[in-house]
Amino acid sequence: MDEILEEELEKKESEEFEERIVEIRRTAKVTKGGKTLSFRVLAVVGNRKGKVGVGVGKAREVPEAIRKAIAAARASVVEIPLYKTTIPHEVFGRQDASKVLLRPAAPGTGIIAGSTVRAVVELAGVQNVLTKCLGSTASVNLALATLNGLKDLVSPEKAAKLRDITPAQVLYGARKEA
């Protein structure tokens, strides 16, 4: 049993993930003796093939905070369905007061997004997407809202079955008959 768990862990670690630090923020705790400084780091990891994770690390030293953030991001990796170079359908992600709208885009559009949302969708492997951030623009909440939206994605076949339409109608919209 332990051998299987070790093999699974090695397999997960050996999988090549690209890492990106989105934000490094210095925080101060004011005490009677003065200010205690620490750092908070937001990191995103992904393999550009449909797997992405977001993590936050806090420590008194920047390198330690970065290490913790990357470890947290690797632990939170989720798999998302991609359709060619975009997402299969429109989706809305929420985290606290932050909201992110993600819409599929035609090839050649690129990633139309702010820096935090861009980091998450780029490392997920999406190449063409339109996004809009609504509400709070706090980096951590935006990254988590984007991840929540990506988690809500379903494959075109599954979406079509749920809505009782064809997969083509999910991807290209329902055609009106004259």
UniProtKB/Swiss-Prot annotation:
GO molecular function, one term: rRNA binding
Any Gene Ontology biological process: translation
Pfam families for this protein: Ribosomal_S5 (PF00333), Ribosomal_S5_C (PF03719)
PROSITE patterns membership: RIBOSOMAL_S5, S5_DSRBD
Key words, A-Z: Ribonucleoprotein, Ribosomal protein, RNA-binding, rRNA-binding
Highest rank taxon of the organism: Bacteria
InterPro entries xrefs: Ribosomal_Su5_D2-typ_SF, Ribosomal_uS5, Ribosomal_uS5_bac-type, Ribosomal_uS5_C, Ribosomal_uS5_N, Ribosomal_uS5_N_CS, Ribsml_uS5_D2-typ_fold_subgr
Cellular component per GO, a single term: small ribosomal subunit
S5 DRBM domain residues: 17-80
Keyword RNA-binding applies: yes
NCBIfam families to which the protein is assigned, alphabetical: rpsE_bact
HAMAP family listed in its UniProt record: Ribosomal_uS5_B
UniProt subunit comment: Part of the 30S ribosomal subunit. Contacts proteins S4 and S8.
Family designation: Belongs to the universal ribosomal protein uS5 family.
Domain notes from UniProt: The N-terminal domain interacts with the head of the 30S subunit; the C-terminal domain interacts with the body and contacts protein S4. The interaction surface between S4 and S5 is involved in control of translational fidelity.
Function recorded in the entry: With S4 and S12 plays an important role in translational accuracy.
Protein name: Small ribosomal subunit protein uS5
Organism placement in taxonomy: Bacteria, Thermotogati, Thermotogota, Thermotogae, Thermotogales
